[in-house]
Amino acid sequence: MIAEKVLFLVLDGISDRPCEALDGLTPLAAARTPVLDRLAAEGVCGIMDSVAPGIRPGSDTSHLALLGYPPQEFYTGRGPLEAEGTGIHMTAGMIGFRCNFATVDADGLVTDRRAGRISGTEPLAEAIREGVDLSGLGLEFRFEAGAGHRAALALIGEGLGDKVSSNDPKKEGVQPLTIRPGSDDPADAKTARACNEFIRQSREILDGHPVNVRRMEEGLPPGNLLLIRGAGKMGALPQFPERYGLSGSVISAATLISGIGMVVGLEHIPVPGTTGSVDSDLDAKVRAAIGELGRKDFVLMNIKGADEAGHDGKSIQKRDFIEVIDKALAPLLDLKNTLILVCADHSTPCSVKDHSADPVPVVIRGPGVRIDRTNRFDEVSCAEGGLHRIRGRDLMPIILDLINKSHKYGA
């Protein structure tokens, strides 16, 4: 029997390194995961370098690689992908950026790069749209709130470049940086000026906004600064249905992932109650994925909360959320005629509080799969599986072969 459907499940940042608080285990190894372990026992396992050994992948470059779009060939910056995911349609002449709502104190020092993982930022975004004016530079802009502390910006106008730096200092207790051009090209200088002006005007708006006033009264960090980075122009990506002969959907509360999916031709399926954080309604997300498999060949589903716990250095919270994920995945065990692939997009070690180059576990379960002897889904157990060590770009060819849609190489 050959599977006709594919569920591609990315457990964002779930992979880790040994944690002292977990007696030297990773959060995944320490968690009770009967569903993931059953998938491992009924499938073929391995470990995977999302981009290449030793390369620390971003969520953008890793997801491109997982979908069979090697970032070395197709990546043009995270900003335009994030913008697409928030509903900003990127066209020629637009420069896209990813943004964070962050917190600065009275001395202008960054005290929280994610403003306490603020949510409900649409009123802040609306105030920025209404109050910021870049017409003096001959430019327009689009700005949209994303999930949690995230947002996206697109600059629109003539003579813009995408080689500019970021104002994000990547640490707290210091001043935000000034955005600078990355070349002598006047187009890059114009973009840098526009970004700095946008940041200046938006900060004036955010400082006194009622949402932030209320947050400060409640002892919460205000979202009173925008950190802008990831500048880029939208590149041309081959469409997924034509590239693979599969219709598809993407289910993700993270605007970056939904943006990548939409850019390559997957239909974005919004799911009420999903947040991209540890409070997300995972049951609703799984139900939506199962429903989409009834009308599409391929469903990409991203679950993100474990990644946030890794970035925050909270190993116990990460372990506990992995157990929540596992429980929510139980209905997938009953899927028929479906190839289920589960992997991480990258490791987010709690000790690093960022992505690392450590390979991630992967399992493929479904009709026709050669079952190996692995019976646990974790970083060490999967390393002993039949897939051995592969790259992210290898996944789609393996999937196509298992569903009998690959093409013979040679006569």
From Swiss-Prot:
Q: In which pathway does it act?
A: Carbohydrate degradation; glycolysis; pyruvate from D-glyceraldehyde 3-phosphate: step 3/5
What catalytic activity is recorded? (2R)-2-phosphoglycerate = (2R)-3-phosphoglycerate
Q: Where is this region: Disordered?
A: 164-190
- Which keywords does UniProt give here? Glycolysis, Isomerase
Its Gene Ontology molecular function terms?
A: metal ion binding; phosphoglycerate mutase activity
GO biological process terms, semicolon-separated: glycolytic process
Q: Which Pfam families match?
A: Metalloenzyme, PhosphMutase
Source organism's superkingdom?
A: Archaea
Q: Is-annotated flag, keyword Isomerase?
A: yes
EC number, as in UniProt: 5.4.2.12
User: What InterPro entries does the database record attribute to this sequence?
Assistant: Alkaline_phosphatase_core_sf, ApgAM_prokaryotes, Metalloenzyme, Pglycerate_mutase_ApgM
Name the enzyme's class: isomerase
* General function of this protein: Catalyzes the interconversion of 2-phosphoglycerate and 3-phosphoglycerate.
Q: Which HAMAP family match?
A: ApgM_A (MF_01402_A)
Instruction: Name the family.
Output: Belongs to the BPG-independent phosphoglycerate mutase family. A-PGAM subfamily.
Q: What protein name applies here?
A: 2,3-bisphosphoglycerate-independent phosphoglycerate mutase
Q: Native species of this protein?
A: Methanoculleus marisnigri (strain ATCC 35101 / DSM 1498 / JR1)
